[in-house]
Amino acid sequence: MDRAVIVGTFEFIGFSLCKHLLEQGCEIDGIHYNKEKEDALINEKRLAIGRNANFYEKNYSSWINSKREIIKNDVIFIDIYDLYIKNELASLREKELIEEFLIKNLDEFKDLQVKIAFLLPIQWLKDISRTHSRLEDAIDILRENNISVSCFYLPVIYGPWQPKEFSFHQALANIKRVKINEREWIHDAIFIEDLICFLSNCSDKLLGESCLLMSSVTGHWQKCADYLSLDYNNNWDSPDLAKGKVIEKAIVCSVKYSEGLEKQRSHILSIEIPDGL
């Protein structure tokens, strides 16, 4: 892959993917969601990228309302996962994204063989036909026009840059009262570096599939929670998901869960931003 567009380039997964692809020599159009308050960590992320001639940062509002350059074989990643976890889905401006970008550029996507990949929370599958029908309808239209659209449904992702909304982050940051967010999926977990390697390796051969990504380690979230001495309910049942619409793919764990968590701890300690983590 020579070039990618990452919508949500400063979100947890979007940024981790952006940094990895830049290290691979890929050219990146990094689109960052404009929010009422800019996260203090965004500047830290800019510093982590540094002066890179292959990185072009763009504001979401300006980008979605302007004439965008779409290049042959572009891969477009749209990170919705983080917005869901942080309860900031309004920042996506779904109607504009669909009408002003996805549908408006349909012919161009087809002619230029563009591939699109959505990064979504696993909870999206709980009521895929009703709650998220507008986006699902747009995806169906794109696929009907032979445009490659892949959807990756993700459990808890952990590691460096994980947002403070996650219980793992809170425990590692020594927050006294750790709260398990109702939007946190406690039935599985994947280490960020393993997810990014998977996304990077499959980006050139995206087949327009819908995939539920799962860890190769059974009870991965629970193992992490026990390592961090989190208090959680063992009796929480995994909700029914619309699995009939997706392919399940196991992500191989490259490091022991404890090593992944300690990497996250070291990263938290390396960044000192009041209220920024």
Question: Where are each of the predicted segments found?
Answer:
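Conserved Rossmann-fold NAD(P)-dependent oxidoreductase catalytic core, especially the SDR/UDP-sugar
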Residues: 74-89, 94-133
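NAD(P)-dependent short-chain dehydrogenase/reductase
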Residues: 131-196
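Mid/C-terminal beta-alpha module of Rossmann-like enzyme folds, strongest
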Residues: 198-277
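Short acidic, S/G/P-rich loop/turn micro-motifs used as interaction or catalytic elements
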Residues: 11-13, 34-37, 63, 82-87, ...
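Hydrophobic anchor at the start of a short beta-strand
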Residues: 28, 149, 210
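N-terminal Rossmann/SDR dinucleotide-binding element
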Residues: 1-70, 250
